[in-house]
């Protein structure tokens, strides 16, 4: 697995296939957004798309084998900078993005802060805020407990600053203000979520607000997967080729 080293930050990623490039942003929240997590997802884009795309799957900072110091300035922009740095390391200027769970929040940060880099985005059950901040706090605290021993540099202020920057807002989709959703011009395919961390309201309101977004409501059950995968294939062939 290649490693991008930038000062104290090390980012590990893997590549497979050939064709138009796609960056894959894995599910699993802060604790598990790493390349290998895709193997446990209802649909694994590494396997499904690498026959016709050059796919890049990365371990986000402080998951898997990637590392970065914890600071009070950490937030969605920190992750976006990492993701763009990986694509820069590969010499890729423009690319599509496929993300699941927290990957949806990562994508929305990318398409608002670097829209010229992203030609298409698939968001599978994006995380959202609908009366569930306590549940996200519990996930954050578990992540901190898991990695805290590896971060003697981090003070309580650093951890709380990181929490606030990520999950302290009232944004429906966490990473971007609701008012910015109608300004997103990137073509997006949204596969609806349906649980406490991925509320369907978040998917529905994103698809309604963003002018070039399309919603797929049913996709996870085995009976629905062939049609949903075909829709993803058509979408990527149209916009990420």
Name each model-derived stretch.
Residues 93-129:
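Conserved hydrolase catalytic core segment
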Residues 78-95:
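Conserved acidic catalytic loop of the alpha/beta-hydrolase fold
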Residues 59-63, 127, 219-221:
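Short beta-to-alpha linker loops that shape the active-site pocket of alpha/beta-hydrolase fold enzymes
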Residues 183-184, 190-192:
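Short beta-strand/loop motif that positions the catalytic acidic residue
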Residues 196-202:
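Conserved alpha/beta-hydrolase "acid-adjacent" motif
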Residues 152-179, 195:
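Hydrophobic, aromatic-rich cap/lid helix
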Residues 6-67:
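Conserved HGGG/HGGXW glycine-rich cap/lid loop of the alpha/beta-hydrolase fold
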Residues 213-241:
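Catalytic active-site module of serine/aspartate enzymes centered on a nucleophile-bearing elbow/loop
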């Amino acid at each position: 697995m290649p490693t991008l080293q930038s000062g104290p930050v090390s980012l590990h990623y893997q590549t497979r296939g050939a064709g138009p490039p796609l960056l894959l942003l894995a599910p699993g929240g802060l604790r598990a957004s790493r390349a290998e997590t895709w193997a446990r997802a209802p649909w694994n884009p590494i396997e499904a798309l690498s026959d016709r795309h050059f796919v890049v799957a990365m371990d986000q900072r402080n998951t898997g084998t990637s590392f970065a110091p914890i600071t009070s300035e950490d937030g969605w922009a920190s992750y976006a900078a990492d993701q763009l740095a990986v694509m820069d390391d590969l010499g890729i200027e423009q690319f599509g993005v496929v993300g699941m769970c927290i990957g949806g929040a990562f994508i929305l940060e990318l398409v608002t802060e670097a829209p010229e880099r992203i030609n298409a985005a698939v968001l599978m059950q994006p995380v959202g805020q609908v009366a569930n901040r306590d549940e996200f706090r519990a996930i954050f605290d578990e992540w901190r407990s898991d990695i805290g021993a590896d971060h003697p540099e981090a003070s309580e202020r650093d951890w709380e600053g990181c929490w606030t920057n990520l999950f302290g807002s009232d944004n429906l989709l966490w990473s971007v203000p609701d008012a910015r959703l109608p300004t997103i011009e990137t073509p997006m395919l949204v596969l609806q979520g349906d649980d406490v961390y991925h509320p369907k309201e978040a998917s529905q309101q994103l698809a309604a607000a963003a002018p070039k977004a399309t919603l797929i409501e049913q996709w996870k059950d085995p009976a629905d997967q062939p049609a949903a995968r075909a829709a993803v294939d058509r979408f990527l062939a149209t916009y990420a080729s």
